[in-house]
Protein backbone atom coordinates (compact mmCIF):
# COMPACT_ATOMS: atom_id res chain seq x y z
CA UNK A 1 0.00 0.00 0.00
CA UNK A 2 1.38 3.41 -0.97
CA UNK A 3 1.85 6.35 1.38
CA UNK A 4 -1.00 8.14 -0.42
CA UNK A 5 -3.32 5.24 0.36
CA UNK A 6 -2.20 4.94 3.97
CA UNK A 7 -2.52 8.56 5.09
CA UNK A 8 -6.13 9.50 5.77
CA UNK A 9 -6.53 13.20 6.53
CA UNK A 10 -9.00 13.74 9.40
CA UNK A 11 -12.39 14.82 8.12
CA UNK A 12 -12.63 17.69 10.59
CA UNK A 13 -9.71 19.57 9.03
CA UNK A 14 -10.48 18.94 5.37
CA UNK A 15 -12.05 21.65 3.17
CA UNK A 16 -15.79 21.46 2.63
CA UNK A 17 -14.99 21.52 -1.09
CA UNK A 18 -11.61 20.16 -2.13
CA UNK A 19 -11.33 21.66 -5.61
CA UNK A 20 -8.42 24.08 -5.97
CA UNK A 21 -7.69 23.83 -9.69
CA UNK A 22 -6.46 26.80 -11.69
CA UNK A 23 -8.75 26.00 -14.61
CA UNK A 24 -10.95 24.17 -15.01
CA UNK A 25 -11.90 25.44 -11.58
CA UNK A 26 -14.52 24.78 -8.94
CA UNK A 27 -18.11 25.02 -10.19
CA UNK A 28 -20.68 25.88 -7.53
CA UNK A 29 -23.55 23.38 -7.01
CA UNK A 30 -26.08 26.15 -7.64
CA UNK A 31 -24.69 26.63 -11.14
CA UNK A 32 -25.08 22.93 -11.91
CA UNK A 33 -28.62 22.99 -10.55
CA UNK A 34 -29.47 25.80 -12.96
CA UNK A 35 -28.51 23.56 -15.89
CA UNK A 36 -31.31 21.16 -14.99
CA UNK A 37 -33.86 23.85 -14.10
CA UNK A 38 -33.86 27.33 -15.63
CA UNK A 39 -31.46 26.48 -18.47
CA UNK A 40 -32.93 23.06 -19.25
CA UNK A 41 -35.47 24.26 -21.86
CA UNK A 42 -32.67 25.87 -23.89
CA UNK A 43 -30.76 22.67 -24.60
CA UNK A 44 -31.48 21.28 -28.04
CA UNK A 45 -32.97 24.52 -29.36
CA UNK A 46 -31.78 26.97 -32.01
CA UNK A 47 -29.12 29.47 -31.00
CA UNK A 48 -30.64 31.91 -33.51
CA UNK A 49 -33.92 32.13 -31.62
CA UNK A 50 -34.91 34.36 -28.71
CA UNK A 51 -34.44 31.99 -25.74
CA UNK A 52 -30.75 31.31 -26.41
CA UNK A 53 -30.12 34.85 -27.63
CA UNK A 54 -31.63 36.10 -24.39
CA UNK A 55 -29.13 33.96 -22.47
CA UNK A 56 -26.27 35.49 -24.45
CA UNK A 57 -27.74 38.93 -23.85
CA UNK A 58 -28.01 38.21 -20.12
CA UNK A 59 -24.34 37.26 -20.04
CA UNK A 60 -23.24 40.29 -22.06
CA UNK A 61 -25.23 42.75 -19.96
CA UNK A 62 -24.05 41.09 -16.76
CA UNK A 63 -20.41 41.45 -17.77
CA UNK A 64 -20.99 45.07 -18.80
CA UNK A 65 -22.33 45.75 -15.31
CA UNK A 66 -19.68 43.70 -13.51
CA UNK A 67 -16.84 45.57 -15.20
CA UNK A 68 -18.57 48.98 -15.32
CA UNK A 69 -17.90 49.25 -19.04
CA UNK A 70 -17.17 52.79 -20.24
CA UNK A 71 -19.35 54.28 -22.97
CA UNK A 72 -18.77 52.71 -26.35
CA UNK A 73 -17.17 49.51 -25.06
CA UNK A 74 -18.79 46.25 -26.16
CA UNK A 75 -18.81 42.67 -24.88
CA UNK A 76 -17.74 40.53 -27.85
CA UNK A 77 -17.67 36.73 -27.76
CA UNK A 78 -16.86 33.74 -29.91
CA UNK A 79 -16.17 30.02 -29.75
CA UNK A 80 -12.72 28.52 -29.30
CA UNK A 81 -11.44 29.86 -25.99
CA UNK A 82 -8.80 32.50 -25.35
CA UNK A 83 -6.32 30.41 -27.34
CA UNK A 84 -8.40 31.08 -30.44
CA UNK A 85 -8.53 34.78 -29.55
CA UNK A 86 -4.73 34.99 -29.81
CA UNK A 87 -4.97 34.06 -33.47
CA UNK A 88 -8.06 36.22 -33.98
CA UNK A 89 -6.21 39.21 -32.52
CA UNK A 90 -3.13 38.51 -34.65
CA UNK A 91 -5.35 38.64 -37.72
CA UNK A 92 -7.74 41.37 -36.66
CA UNK A 93 -6.28 43.73 -34.03
CA UNK A 94 -2.63 44.14 -35.02
CA UNK A 95 -2.12 46.50 -37.94
CA UNK A 96 1.63 46.16 -38.44
CA UNK A 97 3.48 45.13 -35.28
CA UNK A 98 2.90 44.32 -31.60
CA UNK A 99 4.80 44.33 -28.32
CA UNK A 100 4.43 41.50 -25.82
CA UNK A 101 5.49 41.09 -22.21
CA UNK A 102 6.56 37.46 -21.76
CA UNK A 103 6.92 36.04 -18.23
CA UNK A 104 5.45 32.56 -18.32
CA UNK A 105 3.84 29.90 -20.47
CA UNK A 106 0.68 31.78 -21.43
CA UNK A 107 2.02 35.31 -21.83
CA UNK A 108 4.60 33.85 -24.23
CA UNK A 109 2.03 32.00 -26.33
CA UNK A 110 0.32 35.10 -27.74
CA UNK A 111 3.73 36.37 -28.90
CA UNK A 112 4.42 32.98 -30.48
CA UNK A 113 1.09 33.04 -32.32
CA UNK A 114 1.80 36.52 -33.66
CA UNK A 115 5.29 35.50 -34.79
CA UNK A 116 3.74 32.82 -37.02
CA UNK A 117 1.21 35.16 -38.63
CA UNK A 118 2.31 36.12 -42.17
CA UNK A 119 0.36 39.39 -42.27
CA UNK A 120 2.09 41.22 -39.41
CA UNK A 121 5.69 42.00 -38.50
CA UNK A 122 7.81 40.15 -35.99
CA UNK A 123 6.69 41.09 -32.49
CA UNK A 124 8.77 42.97 -29.96
CA UNK A 125 9.08 40.60 -26.99
CA UNK A 126 10.17 41.80 -23.54
CA UNK A 127 11.02 38.78 -21.40
CA UNK A 128 11.63 38.13 -17.73
CA UNK A 129 12.19 35.00 -15.68
CA UNK A 130 9.32 32.93 -14.34
CA UNK A 131 8.15 34.37 -11.03
CA UNK A 132 8.80 37.96 -12.12
CA UNK A 133 7.42 40.27 -14.81
CA UNK A 134 8.62 43.18 -16.97
CA UNK A 135 7.15 46.64 -16.54
CA UNK A 136 4.43 47.43 -19.10
CA UNK A 137 6.00 49.69 -21.71
CA UNK A 138 5.47 51.21 -25.12
CA UNK A 139 7.48 51.26 -28.33
CA UNK A 140 7.00 53.72 -31.21
CA UNK A 141 7.15 50.89 -33.76
CA UNK A 142 4.12 48.98 -32.43
CA UNK A 143 0.35 49.49 -32.66
CA UNK A 144 -0.67 46.91 -30.02
CA UNK A 145 0.78 46.23 -26.56
CA UNK A 146 -0.06 42.92 -24.89
CA UNK A 147 0.44 41.24 -21.55
CA UNK A 148 -1.37 38.91 -19.16
CA UNK A 149 -3.24 40.30 -16.17
CA UNK A 150 -2.51 37.03 -14.41
CA UNK A 151 0.11 34.52 -15.58
CA UNK A 152 -1.62 31.26 -14.67
CA UNK A 153 1.52 29.14 -14.90
CA UNK A 154 3.50 31.09 -12.29
CA UNK A 155 1.05 33.05 -10.15
CA UNK A 156 2.33 36.47 -11.24
CA UNK A 157 -0.21 39.29 -11.57
CA UNK A 158 0.66 42.46 -13.48
CA UNK A 159 -1.50 45.56 -12.90
CA UNK A 160 -3.41 46.90 -15.88
CA UNK A 161 -2.31 50.45 -16.68
CA UNK A 162 -1.96 51.97 -20.13
CA UNK A 163 1.78 52.55 -20.68
CA UNK A 164 3.05 56.11 -20.88
CA UNK A 165 3.57 57.40 -24.42
CA UNK A 166 1.64 54.48 -25.92
CA UNK A 167 -0.12 56.85 -28.32
CA UNK A 168 -2.66 55.11 -30.52
CA UNK A 169 -1.37 51.63 -29.69
CA UNK A 170 -4.10 49.32 -28.44
CA UNK A 171 -3.67 47.65 -25.05
CA UNK A 172 -4.70 43.98 -25.18
CA UNK A 173 -4.84 42.16 -21.85
CA UNK A 174 -5.02 38.39 -21.53
CA UNK A 175 -7.32 38.18 -18.52
CA UNK A 176 -8.06 34.47 -18.82
CA UNK A 177 -7.37 33.82 -15.14
CA UNK A 178 -7.57 37.42 -13.95
CA UNK A 179 -10.98 38.67 -15.10
CA UNK A 180 -13.49 38.57 -12.29
CA UNK A 181 -10.94 38.03 -9.52
CA UNK A 182 -8.47 40.91 -9.85
CA UNK A 183 -9.10 44.66 -9.79
CA UNK A 184 -9.19 46.39 -13.15
CA UNK A 185 -10.19 49.69 -14.76
CA UNK A 186 -11.42 48.61 -18.18
CA UNK A 187 -10.76 52.12 -19.49
CA UNK A 188 -7.04 51.31 -19.26
CA UNK A 189 -7.50 48.58 -21.88
CA UNK A 190 -8.77 48.19 -25.43
CA UNK A 191 -9.25 44.42 -25.47
CA UNK A 192 -9.63 42.68 -22.10
CA UNK A 193 -10.23 39.07 -23.04
CA UNK A 194 -10.87 35.89 -21.07
CA UNK A 195 -12.58 32.50 -20.86
CA UNK A 196 -15.20 31.07 -18.49
CA UNK A 197 -13.25 28.28 -16.77
CA UNK A 198 -11.31 30.32 -14.19
CA UNK A 199 -12.97 33.06 -12.10
CA UNK A 200 -16.28 32.47 -13.85
CA UNK A 201 -16.48 28.81 -12.79
CA UNK A 202 -17.61 27.53 -16.17
CA UNK A 203 -16.47 25.25 -18.95
CA UNK A 204 -13.93 26.15 -21.62
CA UNK A 205 -14.44 26.65 -25.33
CA UNK A 206 -15.58 30.28 -25.32
CA UNK A 207 -13.72 33.58 -25.50
CA UNK A 208 -15.07 36.93 -24.40
CA UNK A 209 -13.46 40.31 -24.99
CA UNK A 210 -14.36 43.72 -23.59
CA UNK A 211 -13.46 45.93 -26.54
CA UNK A 212 -13.03 49.69 -26.69
CA UNK A 213 -14.22 51.98 -29.49
CA UNK A 214 -10.59 52.18 -30.64
CA UNK A 215 -10.35 48.39 -30.83
CA UNK A 216 -13.64 48.15 -32.70
CA UNK A 217 -12.42 50.79 -35.14
CA UNK A 218 -9.18 48.84 -35.63
CA UNK A 219 -11.21 45.73 -36.43
CA UNK A 220 -13.11 47.66 -39.09
CA UNK A 221 -10.01 49.26 -40.62
CA UNK A 222 -8.13 45.96 -40.92
CA UNK A 223 -11.20 44.34 -42.47
CA UNK A 224 -11.42 47.20 -44.97
CA UNK A 225 -7.78 46.63 -45.95
CA UNK A 226 -8.71 43.29 -47.48
CA UNK A 227 -6.49 41.19 -45.22
CA UNK A 228 -7.42 37.50 -45.49
CA UNK A 229 -8.81 36.03 -42.27
CA UNK A 230 -10.41 32.60 -41.70
CA UNK A 231 -14.08 33.19 -40.91
CA UNK A 232 -13.81 31.29 -37.62
CA UNK A 233 -11.15 33.79 -36.46
CA UNK A 234 -12.77 36.87 -38.00
CA UNK A 235 -13.28 39.61 -35.44
CA UNK A 236 -15.65 41.55 -37.75
CA UNK A 237 -17.89 38.46 -37.88
CA UNK A 238 -17.62 38.05 -34.10
CA UNK A 239 -18.55 41.68 -33.52
CA UNK A 240 -21.48 41.54 -35.92
CA UNK A 241 -22.90 38.44 -34.24
CA UNK A 242 -22.20 39.55 -30.68
CA UNK A 243 -24.17 42.75 -31.14
CA UNK A 244 -27.10 40.49 -32.06
CA UNK A 245 -26.55 38.42 -28.88
CA UNK A 246 -25.33 35.37 -30.74
CA UNK A 247 -22.15 33.63 -31.86
CA UNK A 248 -20.98 32.94 -35.41
CA UNK A 249 -21.26 29.18 -34.97
CA UNK A 250 -23.22 27.09 -32.48
CA UNK A 251 -22.26 27.75 -28.84
CA UNK A 252 -22.36 25.29 -25.95
CA UNK A 253 -25.50 26.18 -23.99
CA UNK A 254 -24.07 24.71 -20.79
CA UNK A 255 -20.99 26.92 -20.98
CA UNK A 256 -23.09 30.06 -21.44
CA UNK A 257 -25.51 29.10 -18.66
CA UNK A 258 -22.80 28.24 -16.11
CA UNK A 259 -21.04 31.53 -16.74
CA UNK A 260 -24.22 33.61 -16.66
CA UNK A 261 -25.11 32.07 -13.29
CA UNK A 262 -21.67 32.91 -11.92
CA UNK A 263 -21.81 36.50 -13.16
CA UNK A 264 -25.25 36.94 -11.59
CA UNK A 265 -23.93 35.44 -8.33
CA UNK A 266 -21.05 37.92 -8.30
CA UNK A 267 -23.36 40.85 -8.98
CA UNK A 268 -25.77 39.69 -6.29
CA UNK A 269 -22.99 39.66 -3.71
CA UNK A 270 -21.58 43.08 -4.51
CA UNK A 271 -19.98 42.86 -7.93
CA UNK A 272 -16.31 42.97 -8.83
CA UNK A 273 -15.32 44.77 -5.62
CA UNK A 274 -16.80 41.92 -3.58
CA UNK A 275 -15.13 39.26 -5.74
CA UNK A 276 -11.74 40.98 -5.47
CA UNK A 277 -12.02 41.24 -1.68
CA UNK A 278 -12.91 37.54 -1.51
CA UNK A 279 -9.90 36.43 -3.56
CA UNK A 280 -7.66 38.80 -1.60
CA UNK A 281 -8.88 37.15 1.62
CA UNK A 282 -8.00 33.71 0.27
CA UNK A 283 -4.59 34.86 -0.96
CA UNK A 284 -3.77 36.53 2.34
CA UNK A 285 -4.40 33.27 4.15
CA UNK A 286 -2.28 31.22 1.74
CA UNK A 287 0.72 33.53 1.56
CA UNK A 288 0.83 34.30 5.29
CA UNK A 289 0.81 30.56 6.00
CA UNK A 290 3.61 29.95 3.49
CA UNK A 291 5.74 32.70 5.03
CA UNK A 292 5.20 31.38 8.56
CA UNK A 293 6.33 27.81 7.81
CA UNK A 294 9.99 26.86 7.61
CA UNK A 295 9.41 24.48 4.71
CA UNK A 296 7.47 26.76 2.33
CA UNK A 297 7.89 30.13 0.67
CA UNK A 298 5.86 31.98 -1.96
CA UNK A 299 7.42 31.37 -5.38
CA UNK A 300 6.80 34.98 -6.45
CA UNK A 301 9.37 36.94 -4.44
CA UNK A 302 7.85 40.40 -4.94
CA UNK A 303 4.65 40.67 -2.88
CA UNK A 304 3.34 43.30 -5.31
CA UNK A 305 3.38 40.72 -8.12
CA UNK A 306 1.80 37.86 -6.16
CA UNK A 307 -1.52 36.85 -7.64
CA UNK A 308 -4.57 36.70 -5.42
CA UNK A 309 -6.26 34.14 -7.70
CA UNK A 310 -3.38 31.71 -8.41
CA UNK A 311 -0.94 31.02 -5.58
CA UNK A 312 2.35 29.19 -6.17
CA UNK A 313 4.13 27.90 -3.07
CA UNK A 314 7.65 26.45 -3.18
CA UNK A 315 8.74 23.70 -0.79
CA UNK A 316 12.22 23.03 0.57
CA UNK A 317 14.10 20.22 -1.12
CA UNK A 318 13.55 17.66 1.62
CA UNK A 319 9.75 17.96 1.33
CA UNK A 320 8.42 16.41 -1.88
CA UNK A 321 5.56 18.66 -3.01
CA UNK A 322 4.48 16.05 -5.57
CA UNK A 323 4.04 13.52 -2.77
CA UNK A 324 2.03 16.06 -0.78
CA UNK A 325 -0.22 16.72 -3.78
CA UNK A 326 -0.68 12.99 -4.34
CA UNK A 327 -1.78 12.43 -0.74
CA UNK A 328 -4.09 15.44 -0.89
CA UNK A 329 -5.66 14.07 -4.08
CA UNK A 330 -6.18 10.64 -2.50
CA UNK A 331 -8.08 12.45 0.24
CA UNK A 332 -10.34 14.42 -2.10
CA UNK A 333 -8.31 17.65 -2.10
CA UNK A 334 -7.49 17.95 -5.78
CA UNK A 335 -5.63 19.88 -8.47
CA UNK A 336 -2.92 21.44 -6.29
CA UNK A 337 -0.14 20.22 -8.60
CA UNK A 338 2.16 22.89 -10.14
CA UNK A 339 2.07 23.85 -13.79
CA UNK A 340 3.64 20.92 -15.58
CA UNK A 341 6.27 22.83 -17.58
CA UNK A 342 7.49 24.98 -14.70
CA UNK A 343 9.24 21.99 -13.13
CA UNK A 344 9.37 23.27 -9.57
CA UNK A 345 8.92 21.58 -6.19
CA UNK A 346 5.72 23.46 -5.43
CA UNK A 347 1.96 23.47 -5.08
CA UNK A 348 -0.31 25.74 -7.12
CA UNK A 349 -3.62 26.81 -5.62
CA UNK A 350 -6.60 28.30 -7.42
CA UNK A 351 -8.33 30.94 -5.29
CA UNK A 352 -11.08 32.10 -7.61
CA UNK A 353 -14.27 33.65 -6.18
CA UNK A 354 -16.12 30.30 -6.07
CA UNK A 355 -13.49 29.02 -3.63
CA UNK A 356 -14.40 29.70 0.01
CA UNK A 357 -11.53 31.44 1.85
CA UNK A 358 -12.17 29.11 4.79
CA UNK A 359 -11.43 26.19 2.47
CA UNK A 360 -8.06 27.75 1.65
CA UNK A 361 -7.31 27.85 5.37
CA UNK A 362 -8.39 24.22 5.64
CA UNK A 363 -6.09 23.32 2.75
CA UNK A 364 -3.11 24.78 4.60
CA UNK A 365 -4.04 22.71 7.67
CA UNK A 366 -4.13 19.61 5.50
CA UNK A 367 -0.71 20.36 4.06
CA UNK A 368 0.71 20.81 7.56
CA UNK A 369 -0.83 17.50 8.63
CA UNK A 370 0.61 15.66 5.63
CA UNK A 371 4.10 17.17 5.88
CA UNK A 372 4.33 16.23 9.56
CA UNK A 373 3.82 12.59 8.54
CA UNK A 374 6.08 12.34 5.50
From Swiss-Prot:
| Enzyme kind, highest EC tier | transferase
Keywords assigned by UniProt?
Answer: Amino-acid biosynthesis, Aminotransferase, Cytoplasm, Pyridoxal phosphate, Pyridoxine biosynthesis, Serine biosynthesis, Transferase
**Where along this sequence does the record place binding of L-glutamate?**
48
- An example of a Pfam family matching this protein is Aminotran_5
Instruction: Please state where this protein is localized.
Output: Cytoplasm
The note on the cofactor says: Binds 1 pyridoxal phosphate per subunit.
Gene Ontology CC annotation, any one: cytoplasm
> What GO biological process terms does the UniProt entry carry, in alphabetical order?
glycine biosynthetic process, by transamination of glyoxylate; L-serine biosynthetic process; pyridoxine biosynthetic process
Names of the cofactor(s): pyridoxal 5'-phosphate
The entry sums up its family as follows: Belongs to the class-V pyridoxal-phosphate-dependent aminotransferase family. SerC subfamily.
How it assembles, according to the record, is:
Homodimer.
Q: What is the purpose of this protein?
A: Catalyzes the reversible conversion of 3-phosphohydroxypyruvate to phosphoserine and of 3-hydroxy-2-oxo-4-phosphonooxybutanoate to phosphohydroxythreonine.
Protein's UniProt name: Putative phosphoserine aminotransferase
Protein encoded by which gene: serC
Amino acid sequence: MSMADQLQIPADIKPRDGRFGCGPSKVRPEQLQALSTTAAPLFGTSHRQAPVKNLVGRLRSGLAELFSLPDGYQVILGNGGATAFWDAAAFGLIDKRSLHLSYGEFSSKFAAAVAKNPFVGDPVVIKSDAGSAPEPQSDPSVDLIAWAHNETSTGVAVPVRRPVDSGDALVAIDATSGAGGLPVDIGETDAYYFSPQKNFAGDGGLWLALMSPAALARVESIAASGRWVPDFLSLPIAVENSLKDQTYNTPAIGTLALMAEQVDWMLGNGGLDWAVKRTADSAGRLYSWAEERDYTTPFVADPKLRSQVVGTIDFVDDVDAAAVAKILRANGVVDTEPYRKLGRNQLRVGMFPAVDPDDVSALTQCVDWVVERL
